[in-house]
Amino acid sequence: MKKVLALVVAAAMGLSSAAFAAETATPAKTAAPAKTTQTTQHHKKQHKKTVEQKAQAAKKHQKKDGKKAPAKSTSKTTSQPAA
């Protein structure tokens, strides 16, 4: 049974390789493909920021007066005098 299967597979591969060889051996009889025209893409120039815009952006990201927000205390202290 295995020999029969091997022969069938070999025959199928032989036929496919023969068909492939015949296909590649014959010269192409179709007309030459149409000539394609190349189009060039124009890229837009990037807009560069002016010096004033850069300065404004730098000011925006600076910390105000170098002060940090006061830290929240987690402990509860009662400094009110008893009445």
From Swiss-Prot:
Q: Which UniProt keywords apply?
A: Periplasm, Signal
Post-translational events: Proteolytic processing gives rise to the active protein.
Span of the secretion signal? 1-21
Q: Where, subcellularly, is it found?
A: Periplasm
Is RNA-binding tagged as a keyword? Answer: no
Q: Which residues form the propeptide?
A: 22-56
Q: Spell out the GO cellular component terms annotated for this protein, sorted alphabetically and separated by semicolons.
A: periplasmic space
Q: Where is the composition biased (Basic residues)?
A: 57-70
* UniProt-annotated stretches for the region Disordered: 22-83
Coiled-coil ranges (or none)? none
Q: Which InterPro entries match?
A: Acid_shock
- Family that this chain belongs to: Belongs to the Asr family.
Role summary:
Required for growth and/or survival at acidic conditions.
- What protein name does the entry list? Acid shock protein
